[in-house]
Amino acid sequence: MTAQHQSDTLLHRLNTLPPKRYGVFLLNDDYTTMEFVVEILTEIFMLGQEQAVAVMLLVHHEGKGLCGTYTRDIAQTKQQQVMQRAKAEGHPLQCIVEEI
């Protein structure tokens, strides 16, 4: 195998790596209702009711819960949707994005 062929093969592999994944997390607070968190999880993250309740309980008991993993742009959009909805409805709910 020539050096040029090895270089081309490596470049091809680098160009075809999957995009990085980012987790969108909700953070617990003492004021946001559990019902609102479940609403966010079902309407923005499209979780089923049972899964939404499980994530909400994780947020409540552990302080942080993963809502889903996405590419960076989608994760940031989901975060903005959560923050806008929480603000509009008077909840201090916080949402963060972290590279997974």
From Swiss-Prot:
Protein name per Swiss-Prot or TrEMBL: ATP-dependent Clp protease adapter protein ClpS
Record text on subunit structure and interactions: Binds to the N-terminal domain of the chaperone ClpA.
NCBIfam families in the cross-refs: PRK00033.1-5 (NF000672)
Organism field: Neisseria meningitidis serogroup B (strain ATCC BAA-335 / MC58)
Functional note: Involved in the modulation of the specificity of the ClpAP-mediated ATP-dependent protein degradation.
PANTHER family in the record: ATP-DEPENDENT CLP PROTEASE ADAPTER PROTEIN CLPS, ATP-DEPENDENT CLP PROTEASE ADAPTER PROTEIN CLPS1, CHLOROPLASTIC
Transmembrane segments: none
Entry's family note: Belongs to the ClpS family.
GO biological process, one term: protein catabolic process
Protein encoded by which gene: clpS
InterPro entries: ClpS, ClpS_core, Ribosomal_bL12_C/ClpS-like
SUPFAM superfamilies with a match to the protein in the record: ClpS-like
